[in-house]
Amino acid sequence: MIELKTLLDLPLHFLHLKQIHCLLLTSPIFYTRRDLFLSRLLRRCCTAATQFRYARRLLCQLQTLSIQLWDSLIGHFSGGITLNRRLSFLAYRHMRRNGVIPSRHTFPPLLKAVFKLRDSNPFQFHAHIVKFGLDSDPFVRNSLISGYSSSGLFDFASRLFDGAEDKDVVTWTAMIDGFVRNGSASEAMVYFVEMKKTGVAANEMTVVSVLKAAGKVEDVRFGRSVHGLYLETGRVKCDVFIGSSLVDMYGKCSCYDDAQKVFDEMPSRNVVTWTALIAGYVQSRCFDKGMLVFEEMLKSDVAPNEKTLSSVLSACAHVGALHRGRRVHCYMIKNSIEINTTAGTTLIDLYVKCGCLEEAILVFERLHEKNVYTWTAMINGFAAHGYARDAFDLFYTMLSSHVSPNEVTFMAVLSACAHGGLVEEGRRLFLSMKGRFNMEPKADHYACMVDLFGRKGLLEEAKALIERMPMEPTNVVWGALFGSCLLHKDYELGKYAASRVIKLQPSHSGRYTLLANLYSESQNWDEVARVRKQMKDQQVVKSPGFSWIEVKGKLCEFIAFDDKKPLESDDLYKTLDTVGVQMRLPDELEDVTAES
């Protein structure tokens, strides 16, 4: 019997488990403790569909288990894969058929399983809880509140919460965490303040949940107050759990110096901590710092997860760091890390922005799963590279794959139509947003249509569309019209569009520069001088733009006519000269062809 108990703890093949089952049924020495061994066997037979069916038959053979063993079985099944969770429901049903009364430990794991599955009915178990008089038990009640709130069923959660006379920290945390999970971060913060007023001390779970809330609404002041409350408990240095949440909160609030300070003071860090710091730098547009932290992470022998890699790839895409992005891609392949939809979409975006359309297509085709963001990234890639018809065709391939477009998808495909001169196709797509997809076009979609009409010289139609807009035209809409007027030398309409843009953005130097360019195109130098004077009178300062360039895997930042002399300046300017030659080459070839 001892040998059999030891045998059941070993990693066994399913066939061996069935052989042990036969032994239990046929050998008389196991008769008195057969149910105990069957329950242990049952824990091992539920990792695949075939084993699930076998496990159901095993359940039916159990007859004399105590409530403690039933609770143990249900708890084991409820925390596993989907099939296991369904097995926990069957175990409960069989337990009741055998006349066993559930305990306060029976329902919390069942509730955890039912709320995770989403397609199951939690109210049936709630009714059983009331039937057996366990609804007033704090342990069971907190599980109900946690389940209802995490599923967004706040009416039911609030009724239980308001009816509870002895609200402990678990009760409060269940509500706070539920609000955070369902996008009501502000409500979570209100509940936290109320909890503090009642004198209930927060635990680590409460602090983590409320820090998430502060990060989501980017309320660094509130986040700092929570940080202060945590320090008041006498914990000078944060553990991994709290520290990672603090780094994440400060990062989302763009306070990357605070995030770095917390990170540096932590005695130990895990992949979540490193990822939070990297994501914070990327969100704050400190892309180079984010990539440097990633390199430090690898040197510290901390293996990145999918979220880490997606953040780093996003940083590479923003600054066009193709070499670094390829290294990350190679790291994923070398370490057999499956490229999920998030990482795949970011990779496509990186290769598209760096001019490597073929590599983007390769990543797209190799993805096992594609969501709307993946399709949109690829459509946008074709559009950005001038393959308007391919972008248009891919959009309809996406629809035939039963993936519904979102607002960004329409932005991408309408932009493709604008760049490809597909006026009628763009017009049909724009009308289909409301007619077929029940989606109200936003100002950015109108801007795409204005750009589409304007590029084809249909300036009056573009202006008429602006006048019919159900919302106030934005600077992007007027900017699209202005660009088209400049292209087709319609200076009168261009002046009107420019005046509307300047009215919306009176402190934006670029708008005045565009208007001055329009006047210089028409050789109206008096108006050019007037615009320059207007900028000076209104103290509009033209801030120099800056760019990044990757040289030998190192990212360099520079502005126009930069006279700084970094160590790598020679390599940097050689690279820029090469880029300049390549940009001029098509025009020079065209001139030679025309002359010949």
UniProtKB/Swiss-Prot annotation:
Keyword terms: Repeat
Keyword Repeat: yes
GO molecular function, one term: RNA binding
Any GO BP: RNA modification
Disulfide bonds: none
Record-linked InterPro entries: E_motif, Pentatricopeptide_rpt, PPR_At4g14850-like_plant, TPR-like_helical_dom_sf
Gene3D superfamilies attached to this UniProt entry: Tetratricopeptide repeat domain
Region (Type E motif): 477-552
PPR repeats: 66-102, 103-136, 137-167, 168-202, 203-237, 239-269, 270-304, 305-339, 340-370, 371-405, 406-436, 442-472
Family: Belongs to the PPR family. PCMP-E subfamily.
Organism: Arabidopsis thaliana
Pfam name, any one: PPR
Location of the region described as Type E(+) motif in the Swiss-Prot/TrEMBL record: 553-584
Protein name: Pentatricopeptide repeat-containing protein At1g50270
Lineage, uppermost ranks: Eukaryota, Viridiplantae, Streptophyta, Embryophyta, Tracheophyta
PANTHER family assigned: PENTATRICOPEPTIDE REPEAT-CONTAINING PROTEIN
Designated gene of the protein: PCMP-E42
Recorded superkingdom: Eukaryota
